[in-house]
Amino acid sequence: MKLLGVDTGGTFTDFVWFDGQRLGIHKVLSTPQAPERAILQGIRELGLQGVRFYLVHGSTVATNAVLEGKGVRTVYITNYGFGDVLTIGRQARRELYNLQPQPEAPPVAAELCLETGGRLAADGSVVEPLSERELEALSARLRELAPQAVAINLLFSFIDDRFERQIERHLPDTLFISRSSDILPAQGEYERGIACWLNAWVGPRVQGYVQRLERLVQPAPVHVMQSSAFTIRADQAAKRAVNLLLSGPAGGLMGARRIGDEVGRPHLLTFDMGGTSTDVALIDGQVKLTSEGSIGPYPVAVPMVDMHTIGA
């Protein structure tokens, strides 16, 4: 079976195919409004229609949705008294010493932040239970707000996620639901909340794209490159958009490391310049990961390759 790698950039969509003996490359112009169209065009030009192949894809759909602010209407659910956590953020700010800083828009509008019970203490004990009345109140507000996605981030849910799961079970199946205990089961309600909200905010965009791509290339199995440089099945990627924010650049780093291994150069400085951005990273035998990355104004605590990006 042929292996086909596809990286969608802002300007070009690049293809690399390998049949076990030969390696080939191809390039077409990207189609930003519908990235899957450029992929299908490249497959046709390579003569791979009807040929059995395995597709590994590096995508910028999640990245662009975040940077361009094109997420969907998303409700954020948290515990009583913590609805402003994502707005307050951490002390680290762009203009920390500016006495009159320009205020930034909050990630989530106040009317889309819902507070409820189901609060745990740091040891996992229940501080405040989650009642049926509160669940019904959440459902009523969601019907009024009519979101496409919901992010659920309760205190200390990484210890025990029973209340997050209880809320999820009470929500309509038509909503894209993101639980912080699933997306980033780690300490720190701000970082966990941002990751959970980002996943819900751009998740439907990524899900729709991945499903369209799978239909276009079927029966070829599709895997998507994650920000951590590990691949994930397309159906799983559709649920974990926040793990795809550096999908394309991560694949480039893995390719650079492989070339370094082949020529006996384990220590590399990589420079990946595309039509939209330029990515720079260090490889010291292995691709380095960080949980202190960022995308646009948002900190992203999910594992991702450690690189620096500037405009091209």
Residue ranges, per PLM feature:
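N-terminally biased helix-coil "hinge/interface" segments that flank
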Residues: 1-312
